[in-house]
UniProtKB/Swiss-Prot annotation:
Keywords: Cytoplasm, DNA-binding, Transcription, Transcription regulation
Name this polypeptide is given: Probable transcriptional regulatory protein FTN_1028
Entry-linked Gene3D superfamilies: 1.10.10.200, 3.30.70.980
Highest rank taxon of the organism: Bacteria
Family recorded in the similarity comment: Belongs to the TACO1 family.
GO molecular function: DNA binding
Location(s) in or outside the cell: Cytoplasm
GO biological process, any: regulation of DNA-templated transcription
Keyword flag Ubl conjugation: no
Length: 248
């Protein structure tokens, strides 16, 4: 299991997301709508929808907004008929990147994604070119200061696959993606509120970068995340706290 702390990345990511709150909500609503369309509107029988709702609530989305998105998707609204597309490529320094999109026009989306890679010193790859480096899993991250022993006991009892405590005191709880929402709910019920919780593609081996390359990779990820059709971007870059502080 990878032992890299998510804490520095989370703080950096949250600062960026605060400035893009409207766009983040649009992406979350789209994920809820598509999850409901594909798997039905009952979150108890639809793990993907349950995870999408949990992420939306963690981002302070209102329950009314969430419910409207579920109804729209489950009702088969034609505007919800977008398809999911995944692109893979390499960024500066050979960093592996996965880009998950939802689109009603593949040609538009691939053109925009390719342009972002090319303008940032990377290149779009073929299907499978980097996906083998990643494992899909749930990661629930806690800030330094949480009661490690108590958290470990509750998490393992709830079915967590692994728990990693990092040098900075932060803790990551790893789950099977299908058990993610259930484990998160148990932790919340027991009083353990995470700083971040998501089903993600986690790289077993991280790419170590210097400050200049890290800044270029961050710029590429920002460009990709700003594209309307892009839902999520994953990379194997190891953005350490030291690197983030150097970049500012």
């Amino acid at each position: 299991m990878a032992g890299h702390s998510k804490w520095a990345n989370i703080k950096h990511k949250k600062a960026k997301e605060d400035a893009k709150r409207g766009k983040i909500f649009t992406k979350l609503i789209r994920e809820i709508t598509v999850a409901a369309r594909l798997g039905g509107g009952d979150k108890d029988a639809n793990p993907r929808l349950r995870a999408a709702i949990a992420t939306a609530l963690a981002n302070n989305m209102s329950k009314d907004t969430i419910e409207r998105a579920v109804v729209k998707g489950a009702g088969g609204d034609e505007s919800a008929n977008v398809e999911e597309v995944r692109y893979e490529g390499y960024g500066p320094g050979g960093v592996a990147i996965i880009v998950d999109c939802m689109t009603d026009n593949r040609n538009r989306t691939v053109g925009e994604v390719r342009h972002a890679f090319t303008k940032s010193g990377g290149n779009l790859g073929t299907d499978g070119s980097v996906a083998y480096m990643f494992t899909k899993r749930g990661i629930i991250s806690f800030a330094p200061g949480v009661d490690e022993d108590a958290l470990m006991e509750v998490a393992l009892e709830a079915g967590a696959e692994d728990i990693i405590t990092h040098e900075d005191g932060s803790i990551d709880v790893y789950t099977d993606p299908y058990d993610f929402s259930d484990i998160q709910e148990v932790l919340i019920e027991k009083g353990f509120n995470s700083e971040n919780a998501e089903v993600t593609f986690d790289a077993e081996t991280k790419a170590e970068l210097d400050a200049e390359t890290a800044e270029k990779v961050m710029a590429l990820i920002d460009k990709l995340e700003d594209l309307d059709d892009v839902q999520s971007v994953y990379s194997n870059a190891n953005f350490t706290q030291e690197l983030i502080e150097q970049i500012g």
